[in-house]
Amino acid sequence: MKIVAFTLVAFVALAGASCPYAAPAVAPAAAPGYPAPPCPTNYLFSCQPNLAPVPCAQQAPAYGSAGAYTEQVPRYVENPSREQLQRFHQRVGMAALMEELRGLGQGIQGQQY
């Protein structure tokens, strides 16, 4: 192992001595980014922060102070009745049973006798 390492070091030293290559000087790093465009007046934003207080919504008289911050939440689905729940569970059970039978049928067909 020492012989291999010595041979490798000798080869690298010989190759480095025979090449007239000099490492280039390191160039100074350029500033990152890109120059910003001048600030025209037709942009939707401005160069300086422009913060203005926005008034809150007026309070609704019937709801007190909460009226300004709440709105109606739509309710799309009613709670299912007992009959609807039974039909749903029956359909899910039948679908699971059919899937199980389908899997058993495929298993039997795949067997060789």
Swiss-Prot record:
GO molecular function, one term: structural constituent of vitelline membrane
Database matches in InterPro entries: Vitelline_membr_Cys-rich-dom
Pfam family, one: Vitelline_membr
Signal peptide: 1-17
Transmembrane annotation, as ranges: none
Residue intervals of the VM domain: 33-70
Subcellular location: Secreted
Annotated keywords: Secreted, Signal
GO annotation, cellular component aspect: egg chorion; extracellular space; vitelline envelope
Gene Ontology biological process terms in this record: vitelline membrane formation involved in chorion-containing eggshell formation
Described purpose of this protein according to its UniProt entry: Major early eggshell protein.
Family, as annotated: Belongs to the vitelline membrane family.
Name of the featured protein: Vitelline membrane protein Vm32E
Protein source organism: Drosophila erecta (Fruit fly)
Gene responsible for this protein: Vm32E
